[in-house]
Swiss-Prot record:
Protein name as annotated: Large ribosomal subunit protein uL1
Gene Ontology terms describing biological process: regulation of translation; translation
Keywords: Repressor, Ribonucleoprotein, Ribosomal protein, RNA-binding, rRNA-binding, Translation regulation, tRNA-binding
Organism: Chlorobium luteolum (strain DSM 273 / BCRC 81028 / 2530) (Pelodictyon luteolum)
PROSITE patterns according to UniProt: RIBOSOMAL_L1
Pfam short name (any one): Ribosomal_L1
Function: Binds directly to 23S rRNA. The L1 stalk is quite mobile in the ribosome, and is involved in E site tRNA release.
NCBIfam families: rplA_bact (TIGR01169)
Similarity comment text for this entry: Belongs to the universal ribosomal protein uL1 family.
Length: 229
């Protein structure tokens, strides 16, 4: 059934056409035909070579209207910071017991935040957390002494993104049930941050393609004029 729905949705999209952002969002909402609240994603093809460290694009952005997803957060810290983390809304708070759980294969959260003083011990499980995108990192704000701020930002819709080996960067920007204007605002915030992070070493056209899609829908290409550099 999913294949049939996808084919029906694909038939409504001109794959060679680039839509205005507002029209692209409207099209994705129109063709999303699933029984659950589908996630809306944006993918950007960048003119960078991620094999070179000075062309890696990674960052974070606060989506004004959040992702629509309930994000589960683990804060790894010592006792002195535990109450602060809990009060800020962390779902799980602890230290050595969670490192042990992770060593045994547990990775049942969406985001892990850690204080700098536990990173030495957390390094023991870097090989488990890294491939899953869960390893705390100072650049993304997930290694910090201000755990309350970090937890609140993640819960409010802060997302992290990083260019992949093929030069693409993608991010969830909301749910198909969001009003169109909220999706447009979230997408614009994400694209502006990607633009801001253009590496000085990148040659040629930076933004080579943008597409918006939802779970089980084809990508709808977006006009790049406003986002080309």
């Amino acid at each position: 059934m999913a294949g049939k729905n996808y084919r029906a949705a694909a038939a409504q999209v001109d794959r060679n056409m680039e839509y205005d952002l507002v029209d692209a969002v409207a099209k994705v909402k129109e063709i999303t035909n699933v029984k659950f609240d589908a996630t809306v994603d944006v993918a950007v093809k960048l003119g960078v070579d991620p094999r070179h460290a000075d062309q890696v694009v990674r960052g974070t952005v606060m989506l004004p209207h959040g992702t629509g997803k309930t994000v589960s957060v683990l804060v790894v810290c010592k006792e002195a910071k535990a109450a602060e983390a809990t009060e800020a809304g962390a779902d799980l708070v602890g230290f050595e017991e969670y490192i042990e759980k992770i060593q045994n294969g547990w990775t049942g959260v969406d985001v892990i935040i850690a204080t700098p003083d536990v990173m030495g011990q957390l390094g023991k499980v870097a090989k488990i957390l890294g491939p899953r995108g869960l390893m705390p990192n100072p650049k993304s704000g997930t290694v910090t002494m201000d755990v309350a701020k970090a937890v609140k930002e993640v819960k409010a819709g802060k997302i992290e993104f990083r260019v992949d080996k093929a030069g693409n960067v993608h991010a969830p920007v909301g749910k198909a049930s969001f009003p169109a204007d909220q999706l447009v605002t979230n997408i614009t915030s994400f694209l502006k941050e990607v633009m801001r992070l253009k590496p000085s070493a990148a040659k040629g056209q930076y933004v080579q393609g943008i597409a918006v899609s939802s779970t089980m829908s084809p990508g709808v290409r977006i006009k790049r004029e406003k986002f080309v550099a």
